[in-house]
A protein has these predicted regions:
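Beta1-alpha1 glycine-rich phosphate/pyrophosphate-binding loop at the start
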Residues: 2-71, 147, 159-185, 200, ...
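Glycine/small-residue-rich loop that forms an oxyanion/phosphate-binding "nest" at active or ligand-binding sites
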Residues: 75-87, 92-145
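Short amphipathic alpha-helical segments
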Residues: 17-18, 41, 121-124, 162-164, ...
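FAD-site-proximal beta/loop scaffold in flavoenzymes
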Residues: 116, 121, 127-143, 239-286, ...
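Phosphate-coordination loops involved in phosphoryl transfer and adenosine-cofactor binding
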Residues: 1-3, 77, 145-147, 202, ...
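A Rossmann-like FAD-binding core segment of flavoenzymes
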Residues: 68-98, 103-106, 167-264, 304-311
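Residue-level detector of alpha-helix initiation sites
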Residues: 10-11, 34, 115-117, 156-157, ...
Length: 311
């Protein structure tokens, strides 16, 4: 029996684990399908305090993980399929059913499952994921050396992906369906200063063109209404994230976009004993440092819950 099971191993879950372990509480992290979360696909993190020269996303995750391990956190590579709420000797406990058939019991649960990449949902896109369509430049950029690619999106992630890809490719074209970008001023300027980056603003992607692998993309010119074809070897989609909460339907209250609702400034969900931290409950900011902070809140909330309920 664990004092707490943490589902998800990004900065929120790992920070919660540090707080729980330092409080002497037995806890385990279920890594999930994307161990380490979004940071494992981030090349350089420049806005996490304590690293004046920046740090790679994977290294930051490894460092936080090592810190939690030092205090006694356990780790398990598995995926939670269901959470069962039961009574045991008059006390509420949770049974977590894993994809390997095992069951873990815990007094509390922290949900830090993060969010996964969104795709466009256009014609021929799904069929060509892995054949020229990708949502991870860090993972796949190397395969496009000396080729032409496009990045779809107008936020910081899109700018970062495009800049990273210029290390390998001949040319990156950023496509955005509006004529203005959502990215921060500094990221916009970095992209605009890069000679390998070109722009297609106010264009809507309509169809992926492929012949065994991606050859181009059809775009709607929003100003003229005409369809244009752009030849490309790779399509990198960077339009945001979808919270990983499908398996939680009926377990905790979720908003219409799939984000977990928490009470006030706490990590408490609609279900007593279940807490949420990180991007899975943050539809606005989605920053590593904020996820870590919310993980700390979850750890403290769990400690308080266990104490108040004599668990």
């Amino acid at each position: 029996m664990y004092d707490s099971v943490i589902i998800g191993s990004g900065p929120a879950g790992l920070t919660a684990a540090i707080y729980l372990s330092r409080a002497g509480l037995k806890n385990i992290i279920i890594n999930g399908m994307e161990p380490g979360g979004q940071l494992t696909t981030t090349t350089e993190v420049e806005n996490f305090p304590g690293f004046p020269q920046g740090i790679s996303g994977p290294q930051l995750i490894e460092d936080i993980k090592a810190q939690s391990k030092n205090f006694g956190t356990e780790f398990l590579q598995a995926v939670v399929k269901d959470i069962e709420n039961i009574e045991n000797n008059g006390k509420k406990i949770f049974k977590l059913h894993l994809d390997n058939g095992n069951i873990i019991e815990a007094k509390t649960v922290i949900l830090s499952t993060g969010a996964s990449a969104k795709y466009l949902g256009i014609e021929n896109e799904k069929e060509n994921i892995g054949k020229g369509v990708s949502a991870c430049a860090t993972c796949d950029g190397f395969f496009y050396r000396r080729k032409d690619v496009v990045v779809i999106g107008g936020g910081d992630t899109a700018m970062e992906e495009a800049i990273f890809l210029t290390k390998f490719v001949n040319k990156v074209t950023i496509i955005n369906r509006r004529d203005v970008l959502r990215a921060s001023a500094i990221m916009q300027q970095r992209a605009k200063d890069n000679e390998k980056i070109e722009w297609k603003l106010d264009y809507t992607p309509k169809k992926v063109l492929a012949d065994e692998k991606v050859t181009g993309i059809e775009l709607l010119n929003n100003k003229t209404g005409e369809i244009e074809t752009l030849a490309t070897d790779g399509i990198f989609v960077a339009i945001g994230r979808t919270p990983n909460t499908k398996f939680l339907e009926g377990k905790v209250e979720i908003d219409d976009r799939g984000y977990i609702l928490t009470k006030g400034k706490s990590s408490k969900t609609s279900t007593s004993g279940i807490f949420a931290a990180g991007d899975v409950q943050d539809s606005k900011y989605q920053q590593a440092i904020i996820a870590a902070g919310s993980g700390a809140i979850a750890g403290l909330d769990v400690e308080e819950y266990l104490r108040e309920n004599n668990l």
